[in-house]
């Protein structure tokens, strides 16, 4: 929650002070709410780089999800990123530079049965970005891409695997080991690797990439395209 964010911000401030000298501001807010977004934009509005990464909806069986559960997932994982894009993209275009990266999921390309809420909501965002990224924004130096993580060693992975273990009746260790063996790299990714890919997409070096869905999954997706 807010305490974790504050700890991360403290470390980031220390790192920047010792290297680039850049200043760091942080806001603890629920970005999926109107009030949370207002709190962020009260600090500043002229963002050149925006990375959206709302927490994924819970795994489960679609038969147990009520309409409100679906709406909450769509609001957080589709509509919130769209609102953030809407609030920043025209300013980016006016300044001639902008980078937007949406953290979605490899389930967009290879849906996972217990992640139906994520599959649906994030696929909607993917379709929206496919159109917007190829509009006049591309000629204004603004790129919009999606970064699709596979199985990374995070709390989110553990939550998903816990759901799979409960559904199958297997132990957590057995489910984790079986999942690991499906990945050609034979391991889970680490957050530092993921951050480096995201940093590249936000850099000037990625100026000719837009509207792409970039998979980082250790080779797990077996499709040609």
Label every PLM stretch briefly.
Residues 138-143, 209-211:
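Short, small/polar-rich loop/turn modules that mediate ligand/substrate recognition or access, typified
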Residues 168-172, 183-194, 205:
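A conserved structural motif in NAD(P)-dependent oxidoreductases
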Residues 54-59, 219:
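Conserved NAD(P)H cofactor-binding loop of Rossmann-fold oxidoreductase domains
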Residues 85-86, 130:
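A short, exposed helix-loop element centered on a Lys and neighboring polar residues
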Residues 110, 199, 210-225:
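Short C-terminal tail/terminal secondary-structure segment
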Residues 99-138, 150-152:
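Catalytic loop of short-chain dehydrogenase/reductase
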Residues 61-63, 69-74, 100, 179:
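Substrate-binding pocket helix/loop in short-chain dehydrogenase/reductase
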């Amino acid at each position: 929650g807010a305490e974790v964010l504050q700890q991360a911000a403290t470390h980031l401030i220390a790192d920047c002070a010792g290297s680039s000298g850049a200043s760091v501001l942080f806001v603890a807010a629920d970005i999926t709410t109107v009030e949370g977004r207002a709190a962020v934009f009260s600090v500043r509005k002229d963002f050149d780089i925006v990375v959206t990464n709302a927490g994924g909806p819970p795994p489960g069986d679609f038969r147990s999800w009520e309409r409100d559960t679906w709406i909450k997932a769509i609001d957080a994982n589709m509509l919130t990123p769209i609102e953030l894009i809407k609030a920043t993209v025209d300013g980016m275009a006016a300044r001639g530079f902008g980078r937007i990266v949406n953290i979605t999921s490899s389930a967009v390309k290879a849906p996972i049965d217990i992640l139906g809420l994520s599959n649906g909501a994030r696929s909607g965002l993917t379709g929206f970005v496919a159109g917007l990224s190829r509009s006049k924004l591309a000629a204004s130096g603004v790129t919009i891409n999606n970064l699709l993580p596979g199985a990374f060693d995070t709390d989110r992975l553990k939550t998903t695997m816990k759901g799979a273990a409960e559904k199958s009746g297997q132990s957590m260790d057995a489910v984790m080991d079986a999942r690991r063996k499906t990945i050609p790299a034979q391991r889970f990714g680490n957050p530092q690797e993921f951050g480096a890919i995201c940093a590249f997409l936000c850099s000037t070096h990625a100026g000719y990439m837009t509207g792409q869905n970039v998979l980082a999954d250790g080779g797990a997706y077996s499709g040609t395209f």
